[in-house]
């Protein structure tokens, strides 16, 4: 199980959105990813993410609506 992959559900550990649930939407390079979900869609350092065991099925570069639907289907949307 790769820790950093598209669709991996993570918890942000730094910044104003610390403690919120997010999903990796795209991988930019070895240090940065694009996250979306219960946080604003933005670039994030992987050192500021704590990957969970959960993974949602989304395509690379999925829209915010697709991410929210996948989180809702997985029952993770209410974790705030």
From Swiss-Prot:
Please name the InterPro entries in this protein's record. Answer: KOW, Rib_uL2_dom2, Ribosomal_eL14, Ribosomal_eL14_arc, Ribosomal_eL14_KOW, Translation_prot_SH3-like_sf
Paired cysteines (S-S): none
Under Gene Ontology molecular function, one entry of this record is: structural constituent of ribosome
Q: Which GO terms describe its biological process?
A: ribosomal large subunit biogenesis; translation
Please provide one cellular component term from the Gene Ontology annotations of this protein.
cytosolic large ribosomal subunit
Q: Does the keyword Ribosomal protein apply?
A: yes
Organism superkingdom: Archaea
Q: Give the UniProt keywords, A-Z.
A: Ribonucleoprotein, Ribosomal protein
- What are the boundaries of the signal sequence? none
In which family does this protein belong, per the annotation?
Belongs to the eukaryotic ribosomal protein eL14 family.
PANTHER family per the UniProt record, alphabetical: 60S RIBOSOMAL PROTEIN L14, LARGE RIBOSOMAL SUBUNIT PROTEIN EL14
Protein known as: Large ribosomal subunit protein eL14
Organism of origin is: Methanocaldococcus jannaschii (strain ATCC 43067 / DSM 2661 / JAL-1 / JCM 10045 / NBRC 100440) (Methanococcus jannaschii)
